[in-house]
Amino acid sequence: MLQEPINLPKWLEENQHLLKPPVNNFCIQRGGYTVMIVGGPNARTDYHINQTPEWFHQKKGHMTLKVVDDGEFRDITINEGDIFLLPANVPHNPVRYADTIGVVVEQDRPEGMKDALRWYCPNEKCREIVFENSFQLVDLGTQIKEAILDFDGDIEKRTCKACGTVATSRP
């Protein structure tokens, strides 16, 4: 049976309390694609690597999408009202600010396709990969948060092998 349309302003009014750190997302529709509402502020340092594209729409306020584009670290600003399609396999870190709301649409992953969370060394002279966690993503609502908390709780995973700098899961 088809799901009824969702009135987004009404949903936000009634459910904004569901947008909790560290990811601040809530999956409102599933079925081939997952539609998430994402609030700010968030506090993450990981870069998500998704083998499928991700569609962003900034409903309220602006956000910064930190990406690694052909080996270069750069920021993409997505302003209120903007849409942006991030190609597959681009490491990205969505930075959301206080009192902002976005919608993200991701394709459900086929069996065997792995997502990854990657942390880079925070030392700008180094920027080597500190740790990467690959996993079969089945539940966007819980697995990203679990991977972040796992990284946060293990200093060995957070220590850069190249320069010794200790990374954190929050900026």
UniProtKB/Swiss-Prot annotation:
Where would one find coiled-coil regions in this protein?
none
The cofactor required is: Fe(2+)
Q: Which UniProt keywords apply?
A: Cytoplasm, Dioxygenase, Iron, Metal-binding, Oxidoreductase, Pyridine nucleotide biosynthesis
Q: Which Gene Ontology terms describe the biological processes this protein takes part in?
A: 'de novo' NAD biosynthetic process from L-tryptophan; anthranilate metabolic process; L-tryptophan catabolic process; quinolinate biosynthetic process; quinolinate metabolic process
Q: Name one GO cellular component term.
A: cytoplasm
**Could you say which residues bind a divalent metal cation here?**
C121, C126, C160, C163
Give the top-level enzyme category: oxidoreductase
The UniProt annotation places Fe cation binding at H48, E54, H92
What Gene3D superfamilies does the entry give? Jelly Rolls
Example of a GO MF term: 3-hydroxyanthranilate 3,4-dioxygenase activity
Residues holding O2: R44
What EC number(s) does the entry state?
1.13.11.6
Report the pathway entry: Cofactor biosynthesis; NAD(+) biosynthesis; quinolinate from L-kynurenine: step 3/3
Q: What are the annotated disulfide bridges? A: none
- Subcellular location, record wording: Cytoplasm
The entry's substrate-binding residues are: E54, R96, E106
Q: Which reaction does it catalyse?
A: 3-hydroxyanthranilate + O2 = (2Z,4Z)-2-amino-3-carboxymuconate 6-semialdehyde
Role this protein plays: Catalyzes the oxidative ring opening of 3-hydroxyanthranilate to 2-amino-3-carboxymuconate semialdehyde, which spontaneously cyclizes to quinolinate.
Question: Which family does the entry's similarity section mention?
Answer: Belongs to the 3-HAO family.
Question: HAMAP family per the record?
Answer: 3_HAO (MF_00825)
Name under which the protein is recorded:
3-hydroxyanthranilate 3,4-dioxygenase
Organism this protein belongs to? Yarrowia lipolytica (strain CLIB 122 / E 150) (Yeast)
Name of encoding gene: BNA1
